[in-house]
Structures are given as C-alpha cells and as structure tokens.
Amino acid sequence: VFRYDSLGQDFKGNISLPLKVSAAHRFIALNKNTYLFFCEARKGNKMVVYDIDQKKIISEMYNLPRFLFFKTFYHHTYSPFYIYENKVHFVQSYNGDVFTFENNSLVPKYHWDFGKQNFDISGLKDESYEYYNKYARTVGAKYANTFISYVENSRYYIARFAYDNKFWTLMYDKQSKKHVVFN
C-alpha cells in the first residue's frame, strides 16, 4: 500500500502487507502506526488491524462470504469507513447498521429496524452475478438494503439505500431520536 499526503501528491512511504492479506480494498488510519484494512477478497475475516511498525496483524474480524462482495450489490460502493467525533465508524452496507471501532473491535452504534423489510443475508447462496442482478430487482427489492452513502454530524445521521427498486433517504435526528424515510 502506497501512502501519500492528503492531496495525493507527496509520497510518504509504503506499507508491506503480510501474505495473509493478499489485497486491501479500503483502509483507514487508526493512528500513526496502525491501520484498519477492509479486504473483500480475503477468505474469512474481511477486516484486519495491522501495526506497520511491528509488521503484524493485531486483530481481525467481520467474516462474511466472498461472493457478497463480487457477485451481489450488497457491498460498499465507496469506503465503508467514516470519522466522526474522532472515532472511526463502519457502515454495514447490506443493512445499514453502523458501528464504531473501539479497542480493536466493532461496537454497535445504530441499527435500523424496517420491520418486515429488514434485509437478512443468512439465506443467500453463492450464485452468479446474473442471478443477483435479477434478485436485486425482484426478491431483494422487497427489503431495505444496499446502503450506498452516509454522513453524520452533531444533529443528524443521513443515509441513502435501495428499496422497491428506488433509492430512499433515511434521516435520523439524534436530538429528538426520531427518523424519517423518503424518496
């Protein structure tokens, strides 16, 4: 992994990943020496916490099947990470659940209950991309899923997701503890 300044102009150095981490698709710095890598193609745990000075994996988590990332729409389009109030946050793309990353583990922060429209991946099987292209427009369209963008500030958490073959917006008011969904 090549590191550059925030403008992407000045090369700062590189990070050599261990063989157990063949590719890092997304990453975020936890501090000067520690990175959280999201590795979609990796077997088993997709998140790896790596200490670049010690050149070792500190922890790993988030075991999901690889086909979700390569044959379905139920994965991240952009980074699954964002920073708010100096904490790294992770958004689970298939159902929109939000976690903070603390003490090398994921801690639940927001869970969205859409009732009968909650999306559950436990019944999904390793099928072709074509199968999931049709599935997303038929069976999958009956559920709130594919959370593609998200932002948080001191007052609101806002996310865009798919439901009923349309994109919808979820707006959660953190002060009133109420939410609204619209398209």
Residue ranges of model-derived segments:
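Structural motif
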Residues: 1-3, 42-49, 95-101, 163-171
